[in-house]
Regions:
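NAD(P)-dependent Rossmann-like dehydrogenase/reductase catalytic/cofactor-binding core
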Residues: 45-136
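Internal alpha-helical scaffold of NAD(P)-dependent oxidoreductase catalytic cores
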Residues: 1-67
Length: 136
């Protein structure tokens, strides 16, 4: 059954927060979710990535809350150990991906809004040569 939501932008950004967070780290590490979660360093990087996305959303006036952030990480924790994101798989297979629409968007919006996004920028810049190669 369908249901109405109070703020569609919040729903869109909740989904974007989840996808962008796992896609970038997955594309960079090229390992499944279980290995990312089991590494304290990589999991912290994932949290930092998500926090930057959250900060950009807030700067854009999106009404995301800490509760939304918590629910995204609950979903990440509930992913199977072998799960990979579709963008990650595209990167690993040398196919064009949504890197520019995900982490690239956060980098551009962060600069436009004066929000620091160093982790997303690092992910984007590290994966950009592979993305350009896939699109050539």
């Amino acid at each position: 059954t369908a249901h109405l939501v109070k703020d569609i932008q919040v729903e869109i950004w909740k989904k974007f927060l989840f996808i962008c967070t796992i896609s970038g780290i997955g594309g960079l590490t090229r390992v499944p979710m279980g290995k990312i979660r089991s590494s304290a360093y990589l999991f912290k990087m994932m949290q930092d990535t998500a926090q930057e996305i959250f900060n950009v959303a807030k700067a854009k006036g999106i009404a995301l809350t800490e509760k939304h952030m918590k629910s995204v990480f609950e979903a990440i924790q509930n992913q199977g150990a072998e799960v990979t994101a579709s963008t990650q798989r595209d990167i690993m297979e040398g196919k064009p991906s949504e890197l520019n629409n995900f982490n690239g968007y956060i980098v551009r919006e962060g600069k436009r809004l004066g929000v620091s996004v160093p982790v997303n920028e690092m992910i984007f810049e590290c994966l950009l040569p592979t993305e350009k190669e896939a699109r050539s």
